[in-house]
C-alpha cells in the first residue's frame, strides 16, 4: 500500500513539472520576436552597412533612387529678388494692336411655334362681289328675328326661374316661421297679454287630444329568482334619454334633452310604482312598466317603435325579459295586436 502511494506521488510530481514546462514553453512561443533575434535582422543590418560604404546613385536632377536630393542651405537674411518676366515678342505685338469696334448685331427672336402658311381657300362661286354682298344682306336680315326670338326665350326662362326661386324662398320662409317658436323677449307693455294668448293656445292644443282611449303597456321583468337593482336601472334610464319628472317616475320627451311633450313613461311594477333617484342604490324591484297613452303627441306608430326599442335595449342591458300588457312573452302576434290598436286610435 505504501509503495502504491509513493508511485502515485512520483507520477503526480512528474505531471505537475510537465505541465509547468509546457506552459512556459507555450508562453515563450507566443511572445513576438524582436528585430534583432529575427532572421531578417541580419539581412537589414548588412544592407545598411553596405549602403553606407557604397556611393549613392543619383540621376540627372540630383535625386537618388528614393527621390531624396542633396541638402540645400539658405541664409536667413537673404533677400528675395524678384525675377524679371521673360520677354515674349508675341505678347508685345498683341498689346500694340488695338481691337476694332464691333457693331452690335440685332437678332430677331424666333417664335416657339412656327405658324404654317395659311392656304387661301379657293372661291368656287360664280357670282360677282356685288352679287355676294346683295346675297349676304337678306341673309343677315333673316337671322336677326331668330336671334331676337332666342333672346326673348332666354329672358322668359330667366324670369320664370327667378319667379320660381322667389316662390321657393317665400315658402321656405313660411315653413321656417311655422317651425320656429317665438323666443324673442317682449320689449313693450303688452307682454302679459301676449303670454296669456300663448298659454291659451298651448292649453287649447293640449285639449285637442281629449281623454286617453287606450294605453299600450310593456313590462321588463327580471328572470326567475332575480331582482332588478336600482344602481343598474338609473344609468340605463339616463342612457335611453329618460328624465325624472311628474308623478315621481321617468318620462321620455320629444326632445332627447328632456324638453317638450311626453311620449311615454316608465313606472315601477311594484306599488306604489314610483322611483327615488336619491336612493336608487338601495332600490330593487321585480320589474318596470313602459306605458304610452293613445292618442298621443306626434306619430303614434313612431312613438311606439321608440318605446319598444327602449324596452328591448333595457332588457339586454340588465339581462331581463320583455313581456306584453298581459305579462305574456312578446311575440309577433302581440305586435300585430298593438299595431291594430294604434291604427284604431289614430
From Swiss-Prot:
Membrane topology summary: Single-pass type I membrane protein
Keywords annotated in UniProt: Cell cycle, Cell division, Cell inner membrane, Cell membrane, Membrane, Transmembrane, Transmembrane helix
InterPro entries the UniProt entry points to: Cell_div_ZipA (IPR011919), ZipA_FtsZ-bd_C (IPR007449), ZipA_FtsZ-bd_C_sf (IPR036765)
SMART domains on file: ZipA_C (SM00771)
Segments on the Periplasmic side according to the record's topology features: 1-6
Region Disordered, residue ranges: 76-103, 121-145
Protein name: Cell division protein ZipA
Organism encoding this protein: Shewanella sp. (strain MR-4)
